[in-house]
């Protein structure tokens, strides 16, 4: 049985194909969905601004009469606002070229209509919550569009990012996705999510085989920068010679460090004897010292028998790289290394070459503003941008998560054609996001500061039309919640009190003895 439609107002004189002004004698909410019937179509609209007015209060009212006016004004309230035209419900949200005529009736959109728009799982969608103004209407997003067009999850600290990302992860795992999380704070290693009784979280070993590094990645570990031209030249030559010898079988992989340092020592001796390069000797000694320091400093990170991190990734698993115990420099190198390898291996598979990765991967970068910074150049930023530009062709999706959008590289952010934006208060953050997302209107931006925890603006290719959504609670548990300082202080003091009681009891027993 069809729902009875509720008329809430009419269109006013001024309208365009994309926007219409309206008046309503009923209380209507910002963000509510409405239906308009014109051009033989059922057109969905979204109330993007609203104001309230009464003719009883004018600029010259007498303050002493305000109480009398209040008693009768509630019966003469009118609501004025703007409706954004979203499209024809029955024609894939195609926007009619003709604006709605003045006087067109406006109805509250039925739940059935909204379900038709925001959909159900067709095998490629996941539910992330319900409409903010209609709790009975679930909101589904398209996983293929998330992976191919990328995603950004943005909010202030405590706005609900961790729960939102967890909901996305759980939905993808139900589709047997290979999800990779670059976990900056160790929140996801304890993520408790089970499929058929099995915990599907896989912690990847944070070990690197230097043989698998690119020269630029290796050079970064050795602290040889772009301006150290002479050191760079000799280290590059020694590194490539060593890798070629390992690849050809001339030496075993466990001889890597010895051969590398041996090459540099040979160059040092050549510089001693050859007057043409004698001025290079000091630089060669310097880079040899850096390699020795590097081998010692990263002895726990490097493993000459470790298989590549990318080869450890599995489908139907939450694959986690825990960066909570390493500094930003190491995190930068590893993220760039993994993204580079993912892109190269997916290209090989798609083009039919051996050594490729046979399944798509969705990578989630927490604290994305650190490694894809708007002000600092990092190796990661380059590969994040590469994956964002090329990933859709090869089944590589990217999710950027940040509580500091203004510090996030606008080029990387603009490549995320899907966004889940929770509460954002800072105007500079709002402007930065709007600059990256051309479809984000000023009216929608204004709503971001008034969102409550867990409420979000969801937009992009993954959803038919922008929506204000109440994100559902994730089923899995993780350690991303705020810690209670008061509770922890109380526990410490209780331990001290218990210890003092034990000491007092001990001395009391001694005295009796």
Go through the PLM ranges and name each one.
Residues 172-174, 342-350, 383-399, 439-442:
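Substrate-engagement module of ASCE P-loop NTPases
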Residues 123-204, 410, 458, 489-490, ...:
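Glycine-rich phosphate-binding loop of nucleotide-binding enzymes
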């Amino acid at each position: 049985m069809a729902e009875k439609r509720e008329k809430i107002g009419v269109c006013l004189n001024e309208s365009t194909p994309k926007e219409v002004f309206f008046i309503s004698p009923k209380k209507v909410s910002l963000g509510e969905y409405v239906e308009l019937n014109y051009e033989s179509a059922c057109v969905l609209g979204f109330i993007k601004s609203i104001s309230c007015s009464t003719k009883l209060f004018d600029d010259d009212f007498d303050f002493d009469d305000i109480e009398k006016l209040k008693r009768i004004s509630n019966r003469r309230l009118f609501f004025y606002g703007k409706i954004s035209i979203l499209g024809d419900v029955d024609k894939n949200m195609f926007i009619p070229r003709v604006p709605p005529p003045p006087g067109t009736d406006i109805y509250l959109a039925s739940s059935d209509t909204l379900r038709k728009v925001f959909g159900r799982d067709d095998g490629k969608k996941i539910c992330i919550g319900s409409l903010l103004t209609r709790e009975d209407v679930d909101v589904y997003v398209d996983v293929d569009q998330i992976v191919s067009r990328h995603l950004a999850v943005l909010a202030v600290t405590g706005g609900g990012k961790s729960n939102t990302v967890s909901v996305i992860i759980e939905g993808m795992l139900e589709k047997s996705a290979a999800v990779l999380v670059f976990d900056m704070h160790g929140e996801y290693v304890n993520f408790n999510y089970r499929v058929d009784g099995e915990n599907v979280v896989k912690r990847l070993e944070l070990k690197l085989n230097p043989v698998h590094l690119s020269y630029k990645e290796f050079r970064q570990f050795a602290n040889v920068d772009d301006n150290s031209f002479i050191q760079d030249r000799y280290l590059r030559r020694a590194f490539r010679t060593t890798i070629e010898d390992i690849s050809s079988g001339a030496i075993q992989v466990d001889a890597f460090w010895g051969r590398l340092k041996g090459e540099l020592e040979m160059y040092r001796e050549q510089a001693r004897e050859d007057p043409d390069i004698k001025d290079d000797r000091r630089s060669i000694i310097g880079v040899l010292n850096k390699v020795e320091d590097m081998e010692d400093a990263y002895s726990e990170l490097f493993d000459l028998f470790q298989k590549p991190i990318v080869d450890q990734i599995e489908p139907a698993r939450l694959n986690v790289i825990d960066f909570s115990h390493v500094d930003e420099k190491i995190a930068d190198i590893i993220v760039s290394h993994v993204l580079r390898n993912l892109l190269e291996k997916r290209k090989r598979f798609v083009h039919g070459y051996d050594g490729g990765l046979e399944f798509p991967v969705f990578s989630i970068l927490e604290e994305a503003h650190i490694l894809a910074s708007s002000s600092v150049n990092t190796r990661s930023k380059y590969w994040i941008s590469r994956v964002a530009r090329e990933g859709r062709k090869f089944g590589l999706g990217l999710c950027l998560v940040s509580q500091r959008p203004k510090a996030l590289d606008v080029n990387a952010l603009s490549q995320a054609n899907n966004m889940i934006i929770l509460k954002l208060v800072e105007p500079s953050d709002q402007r930065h996001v709007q600059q990256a997302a051309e479809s984000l209107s000023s009216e929608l931006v204004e709503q971001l500061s008034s969102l409550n925890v867990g409420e979000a603006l969801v937009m992009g290719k993954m959803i038919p039309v922008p929506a204000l959504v109440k994100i559902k609670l994730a089923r899995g548990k993780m350690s991303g919640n705020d810690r209670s300082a008061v509770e922890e202080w109380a526990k410490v003091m209780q331990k001290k009190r218990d210890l003092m009681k034990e000491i007092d009891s001990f001395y009391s027993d001694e005295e009796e003895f």
